[in-house]
């Protein structure tokens, strides 16, 4: 059952942070309901990542279809970009192997990638997982705030990440000056 706002009981429960309700709902919901996209372009998984609900993300990921795992919200986010933004390292680790190249390289409406967000949050292990999977264009991405993954990694003193990024970046991106 879907409300006139396009929500299921699960998306409402996730949105309200009702973890125990989600734990009961998830095993009892159909595949269609678990993968449902609401009127705001969010799935239960993207909402859970946005809310920082690690336990709910862990329950949802194995139940989600590949299409839902790779879903892009109306704001250009994926579950991966939202998990990186919230610093959910373990969720990023679960998502990366399940995601398509296109979804891993997704640029949000704010000009961020999962890599820039992981660097901003200081998630060194996630950066290490992402760099080999990202396109040159995504690695060189400049956010709407004027940062690259390299400037963000340098700011967080992530020396190993800087060393991994530099050989994969264009000279222009390496010489980019953050705003």
From Swiss-Prot:
ANK repeat boundaries on the chain: 5-34, 40-72, 75-104, 110-139, 145-174
Q: Which UniProt keywords apply?
A: ANK repeat, Repeat
The protein's matches in InterPro entries, at most eight in alphabetical order, are given as: Ankyrin-KH/SAM_domain, Ankyrin_rpt, Ankyrin_rpt-contain_sf
SUPFAM superfamilies assigned to the protein according to its UniProt record, in alphabetical order: Ankyrin repeat (SSF48403)
Q: Which cysteines are joined by disulfide bonds?
A: none
- How is this protein annotated for GO cellular component? cytoplasm
The record's section on PANTHER family has: ANKYRIN REPEAT AND KH DOMAIN-CONTAINING 1, MASK PROTEIN
Q: What is this protein called?
A: Putative ankyrin repeat protein RF_0922
């Amino acid at each position: 059952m879907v409300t006139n706002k396009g929500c299921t009981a699960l998306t409402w429960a996730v949105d309200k942070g009702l973890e125990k309700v989600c734990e009961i709902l998830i095993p009892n919901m159909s595949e269609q309901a678990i993968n449902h996209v609401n009127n705001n372009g969010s799935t239960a998984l993207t909402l859970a990542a946005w809310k920082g609900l690690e336990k709910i993300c862990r329950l949802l990921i194995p139940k989600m279809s590949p299409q839902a795992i790779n879903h892009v919200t109306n704001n250009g986010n994926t579950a991966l970009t939202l998990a990186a933004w919230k610093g959910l390292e373990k969720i990023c680790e679960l998502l990366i192997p399940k995601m398509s190249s296109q979804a891993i390289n997704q640029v949000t409406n704010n000009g961020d990638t999962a890599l820039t967000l992981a660097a901003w949050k200081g998630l060194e292990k996630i950066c290490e997982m992402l760099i080999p999977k990202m396109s040159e264009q995504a690695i060189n991405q400049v956010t709407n705030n004027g940062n690259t993954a390299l400037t963000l990694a340098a700011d967080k003193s992530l020396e190993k990440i800087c060393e991994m990024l530099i050989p994969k970046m264009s000279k222009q991106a390496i010489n980019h000056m953050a705003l």
